[in-house]
Amino acid sequence: MMAPLTDRRHLWNDGSALEVHGVVVTRLTPGPAPVLTAELGGGVAELAGGADQTTLVRLDVPLGGAVGYWHPAAGWDRHLAADWMTGWRAIGLADSAPLGCLYDGSANTLLAYATDRLVATTHLKFGLGERTGRFGIWLAMDLEPGEVCRIRIAEPGRSHADTLRELARWQSPETGLPVPDAGRTPTYSTWYSYHQDVNAAAIEAEAELAAEAGCGLLILDDGWQRGGTGGGYSGCGDWEPDADKFPDFAAHVAEIHATGLKYMAWIAPLLLGQDSAARAALAGFAPHARPEWGCHVLDPRHAEVRAFVVDSCARLVQSYGLDGLKIDFLDSASAYASGTHAEAGNTADPVPTGEPAAEGWIPDVGTAMRVMLAALRGRLHAALGTDFLIEFRQPYTGPAMLEYGNLLRASDCPADAVANRVKSLDLALLAPDVAIHSDMLMWDASAPAEQAARQLLAVLHTIPQISMRLADLPAEHRAMIAFWLGFWRDRRDLLTRGPVLAGRPDELYPLTTVTDAERAVAVLHTVNHLVPLDLSGLREAAVVNATDSGRVVLDLRHQSAVRLTVSDACGRTIREEHTRLALGPSSVAVPPSGLCLITPITEV
């Protein structure tokens, strides 16, 4: 059990310390002093467990020109919080990841760190000291005597994005789950378009239209299962198809496959509904209640729960020929994280952990989740080889989860293009080498096409998930989807595999840019923001105007003779011209949600 460490008076105490790249690493509890290793040129400190059950360490630097602090669970709150403003947060395999970055006004790092404690629970807080003028990060861990936690400190001065990608790769397992090609194709999801009102005929008709629009994957969300009605989760736990909605689920899956789409289904295996048949046998393993959902949360520390989850997931895939699963609500297991530092306002109320010894009992919830997910991976690999898809969503999308999931999705933000952009870019920093999916896209079907397009343009740097009833959309909207998905497919590897530059996190990433040896794509999300361009060596630059303005301002590093091809939100060409763009700012007319293709030409 994590010892109480809530007295803020002790946060800035002295202790055994060392300095790594200008960051002071201080042990605040009794035990061996931190040790600097030779790894990565001396950028890794080791901290060993001591006599005290809880090991507390502080990382701190002078504030300097700090403007914000990024961490995986930042959400909208990216300001410089004082140490008394932030609570302790439990992080582990099922929730977030132990890394973060303090950055300056140029989005360059002042303090960036990561630890290798990715599975077991770590309690974390951060903030600036009003008396010290320093920014601190505190990590509290249960380390056994001799057990070691490695803390990597990045060299300061590099861009926060490059630094975080490097730290995430350091944390990532070498045995990550491969991503089948279907995981990198535009996706149709039934959630916002149908919610629980799904049935075989409707989804089969929608699949035809999704395939025609350019999707390669369909995700059947909540509502396919028995008891999947009423908007809550009171029926979760049985995981059998609703025979009224899907009389022959295996035949239905075959119909979807006939359209050329891969097919995944939603499952929330840790939720035990109050009306489920499974409740009679499993209620004793689910003490944490979610009355607003009509269910309890199964505790994965029990062997019986782990076996139930693995069997439920594997049986669903194998019995019906599915290509994978969207596994939801794994973060609900955080209710069973040990300790006394649950963040104020967390909906997952801590549950007492004084569990009697039992066969297969694993005290740490992160470790239990790892065992459970490893078993599931093994079962699916035995059945399907490496060609299966597992979607996880924020916040259980840290580097350690790459061993068990290969589609990582931004958490729910219906119709909020800004949130979808920010969440998916945050996620891409944590998992730079896997398939990052947007949250499902929805919009007002009666809105002009250029307004609807804003949802898709916000997430061009991800694999987009569409969730609108395609048959009900006006022709302009269908044309818009077809045009932009075609644009995306033609640049898929550039958009989803190239390192995206997006500016400062606290400015919510106003401009996303990605470049390879031949092409560049810049998506402008904020009016009156310059679009820097260097056309040297490029055969094409695409500038996407994802704003309400009818103009974009390019900022060229060199004057260039170019051909401009300008299209509207539906892909209709409205202007072609040859012109010379001068060094520095140049204003170019591009309609809202429109595209400007810039092709350098050689003058003779």
Positions of PLM-derived features:
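N-terminal accessory beta-strand-rich subdomains and adjacent acidic, glycine-rich linkers
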Residues: 1-174, 534, 552-556, 562-571, ...
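Glycine-rich, aromatic-flanked loop segments that form ligand/cofactor-binding clefts
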Residues: 160-175, 217-220, 244-291, 387-392, ...
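Hydrophobic faces of well-ordered beta-strands that scaffold small-molecule active sites
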Residues: 184-190, 218-220, 263-267, 325-327, ...
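Active-site-adjacent "subsite" loops/lids of carbohydrate-active enzymes
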Residues: 185, 192-196, 262-319
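Catalytic domains of carbohydrate-active enzymes, especially glycoside hydrolases
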Residues: 202-227, 319
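Aromatic- and acidic-residue-enriched carbohydrate-binding clefts of CAZyme catalytic domains
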Residues: 224-252, 276-300, 332-370
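Glycan-recognition surfaces
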Residues: 279-295, 299-304, 370-474
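Carbohydrate-binding surface patches
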Residues: 504-563
